[in-house]
């Protein structure tokens, strides 16, 4: 049972459940948006033997982990379950859950599941090789991460699952279903299936029919911040929440993260610096890229969409560099009681802008239709240890992440006509003051860094609060609750240096991709079906 105490009144807190790629969290906020308690548990996705690229989502075990986090968060907050006014859930996007006619979840895959490479290729050939273009025009998605090839894979290889399927939702919706017994999806997350119409914010059943798939398995669509149901007695017994507590429709992690950052108005722009880096720009109305380079997702704000570009493995590349080459710096940082990245940034701050011409080759700009990258490498190294050392390479990596972001933002501006005048930098990368300044210098934009740098759970809590009338609207509340840590103005001289570096990098990267095309090097990552 939930632990009782006397220092709180009923309904003065909100709970957000955040199902990420690598972990699940239960986070409790007060009504001023302050985080009160959090509990987190890592989870592992299941590779199926003899199914290359498979990454199944363990429904039974992961629900147990979610319940564990809920119980522990309540205990850490020292509040009774009756103090929770509402609960909402968010998750990684693209991952799907399938239910049978009895409402039982019977199969799920994580966002990174890539088993359907053959099906992607097969689908691209439909309708005189125009099917993917039709999917993109309607939904803003290509087939690489879509639910359509995964459903086709099930029809081909797991007909026992496919023919029992009654409903499909996203992982955030599954968590809400496990709490309430009610099934629905929201546009921001369901939009990443490639089956949702950007204009109507509802399903486009004809896309499934065009692919020869069933169109009778789509859940009702409800907007973020609306009432889904209430905590069931069964869920209350499993996770110690109070039966009858409202469960509010949540959404996709990036869109709710933008809500938590106050990125809720047209033309507002954010760079989210995590394992992947996302460059997100709000558009006032749906529009897609004629070149299909970037994805378009429904925002949690009704009527608004977000263009989203992705830089691959940016945060992971920095971690690889730290762990592979900077053992000494890690030891020194530990002795000094500081983060190793802070020490590396201090070293890199003494390297001039442009990093002596060193060009990292890791993530390409986003090319959603034909998405692959060159082989990881550093180009234009020097054997002068004063100019080419760990500090130089670290700075070069930070500069390169900013250059890729700037290129992606330029692609968005080219087709949308929306030009950012500043940007919000959040996520783990924004903790670096040097990195934040480099991003300002490369883009030529003022960079705003929030106090709360991981804002997805806060955005989810805002949805919960709006759903029970604690706050009036999503957009107004997102703007009200965001607090700013610092601001970085671009340096015009550095901007000029980086413009030249950017042009050189783009030319060199094109040649490096050609080496992959020729089979001489191995791509950092390729989308399924390439």
From Swiss-Prot:
Positions of disulphide bridges: none
Any Pfam family: FGGY_C
Domain of life, source organism: Bacteria
Catalyzed reactions per annotation: (S)-4,5-dihydroxypentane-2,3-dione + ATP = (2S)-2-hydroxy-3,4-dioxopentyl phosphate + ADP + H(+)
Main location as per UniProt: cytoplasm
UniProtKB keywords: Cytoplasm, Kinase, Transferase
E.C. designation(s): 2.7.1.189
GO terms for cellular component: cytoplasm
InterPro entries named in the record: AI-2_kinase, ATPase_NBD, Carb_kinase_FGGY, FGGY_C, FGGY_Carb_Kinase, FGGY_N
Annotated compartments: Cytoplasm
GO MF terms, alphabetically ordered: autoinducer-2 kinase activity
Membership in a protein family: Belongs to the FGGY kinase family.
Function recorded in the entry: Catalyzes the phosphorylation of autoinducer-2 (AI-2) to phospho-AI-2, which subsequently inactivates the transcriptional regulator LsrR and leads to the transcription of the lsr operon. Phosphorylates the ring-open form of (S)-4,5-dihydroxypentane-2,3-dione (DPD), which is the precursor to all AI-2 signaling molecules, at the C5 position.
Name of the protein this chain belongs to: Autoinducer-2 kinase
Organism for this UniProt entry: Salmonella paratyphi A (strain ATCC 9150 / SARB42)
């Amino acid at each position: 049972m939930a632990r009782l105490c006397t220092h709180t009144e009923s309904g003065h807190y909100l709970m957000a459940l955040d199902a990420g790629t690598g972990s699940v969290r239960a986070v409790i906020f007060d009504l001023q948006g302050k985080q009160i308690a959090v509990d987190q548990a890592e989870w592992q996705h299941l590779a199926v033997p003899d199914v290359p690229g498979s990454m199944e989502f363990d429904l039974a075990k992961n629900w147990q982990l979610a319940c564990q986090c809920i119980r522990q968060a309540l205990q850490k907050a020292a509040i009774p379950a009756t103090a929770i006014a509402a609960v909402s859930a968010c998750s990684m996007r693209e991952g799907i859950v399938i239910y049978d006619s009895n409402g039982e979840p019977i199969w799920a895959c994580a966002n990174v599941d890539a088993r359907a490479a053959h099906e992607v290729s097969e689908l691209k050939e439909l309708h005189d090789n125009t099917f993917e273009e039709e999917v993109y025009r309607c939904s803003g998605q290509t087939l690489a991460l879509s639910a359509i090839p995964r459903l086709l894979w099930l029809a081909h290889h797991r007909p026992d699952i496919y023919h029992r399927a009654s409903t499909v939702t996203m992982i955030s919706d599954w968590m809400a279903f496990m709490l309430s017994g009610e099934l629905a999806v929201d546009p921001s997350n369901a939009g990443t299936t490639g089956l949702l119409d950007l204009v109507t914010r509802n399903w486009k059943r004809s896309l499934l029919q065009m692919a020869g798939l069933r169109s009778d398995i789509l859940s009702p669509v409800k907007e973020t911040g609306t009432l889904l149901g209430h905590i069931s007695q069964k869920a209350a017994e499993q996770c110690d929440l109070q039966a009858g507590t409202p469960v509010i429709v949540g959404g996709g992690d990036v869109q709710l993260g933008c809500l938590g950052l106050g990125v809720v108005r047209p033309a507002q722009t954010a760079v989210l610096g995590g394992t992947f880096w996302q460059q997100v720009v709000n558009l006032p109305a749906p529009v897609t890229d004629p070149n299909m380079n970037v994805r378009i997702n429904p925002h949690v704000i009704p009527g608004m969409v977000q263009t989203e570009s992705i830089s691959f493995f940016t945060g992971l590349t920095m971690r690889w560099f730290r762990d592979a080459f900077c053992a000494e710096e890690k030891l020194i940082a530990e002795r000094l009681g500081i983060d190793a990245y802070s020490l590396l940034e201090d070293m890199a701050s003494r390297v001039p802008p442009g990093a002596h011409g060193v060009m990292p080759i890791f993530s390409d700009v986003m090319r959603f239709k034909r998405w692959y990258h060159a082989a990881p490498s550093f180009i234009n190294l020097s054997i002068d240890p004063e100019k080419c050392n760990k500090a130089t390479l670290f700075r070069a990596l930070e500069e390169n992440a900013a250059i890729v972001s700037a290129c992606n933002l330029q692609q968005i501006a080219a087709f949308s006509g929306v030009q950012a005048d500043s940007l919000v930098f959040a996520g783990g990368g924004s903790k670096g003051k040097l990195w934040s300044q480099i991003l300002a210098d490369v883009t030529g934009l003022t960079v705003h860094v929030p106090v709360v740098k991981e804002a997805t759970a806060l955005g989810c809590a805002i949805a919960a609060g709006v759903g029970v009338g604690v706050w009036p609207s999503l957009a107004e509340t997102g703007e009200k609750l965001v607090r700013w840590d610092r601001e970085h103005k671009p340096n015009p001289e550095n901007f000029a240096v980086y413009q030249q570096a950017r042009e050189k990098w783009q030319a060199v990267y094109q040649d490096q991709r050609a080496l992959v095309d020729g089979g001489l090097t191995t791509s950092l990552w390729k989308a399924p079906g390439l």
